[in-house]
């Protein structure tokens, strides 16, 4: 029995797709993750807490998506991207982004923004998240990539 949520993600129009691994795009997403961290810092220093929250989340999402690009998985649905990464790497690796995703949604769609001190803490967590994914993705071997591709491909077939 496979993972029902992942199987659902494979059926979505813009859901999970197996593609060729793309090291160039993976690196570009990591660069964008770091750029988004800088944007979040600027927004925070300008007291723009809403956009700081959004930039923090996107820095994490770009770092996470760099992993998926590196192993050849495409997805335009954030929940499915996070789910696939959690499935492949473990829930611990996606705990931070899952927490921050909710805060980004609250800020962007409901105008509920945390206090500045909490957003500063989120930014520190995001820096660790991006750094961890940078190290993780940079250290992937061809064998690792093939193992991840094999695991996710099995879910598509189940």
Which residues does each predicted region cover?
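Terminal alpha-helical segments
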Residues: 1-158
């Amino acid at each position: 029995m496979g993972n029902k949520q992942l199987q659902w993600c494979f059926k979505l129009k813009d859901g999970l797709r197996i593609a060729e691994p793309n090291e160039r795009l993976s690196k570009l997403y990591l660069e964008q993750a770091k750029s988004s961290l800088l944007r979040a810092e600027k927004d925070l220093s300008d007291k723009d807490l809403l956009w700081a929250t959004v930039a923090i989340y996107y820095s994490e999402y770009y770092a996470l998506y760099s992993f998926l690009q590196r192993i050849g998985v495409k997805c335009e649905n954030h929940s499915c991207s996070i789910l696939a990464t959690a499935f492949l790497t473990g829930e611990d690796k996606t705990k931070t982004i899952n927490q921050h995703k909710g805060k980004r949604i609250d800020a962007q769609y409901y105008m509920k923004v945390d206090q500045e001190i909490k957003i500063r803490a989120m930014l520190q967590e995001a820096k660790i998240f991006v750094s961890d994914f940078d190290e993780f993705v940079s250290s992937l071997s061809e064998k690792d990539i093939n193992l991840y591709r094999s695991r996710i491909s099995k879910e598509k077939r189940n």
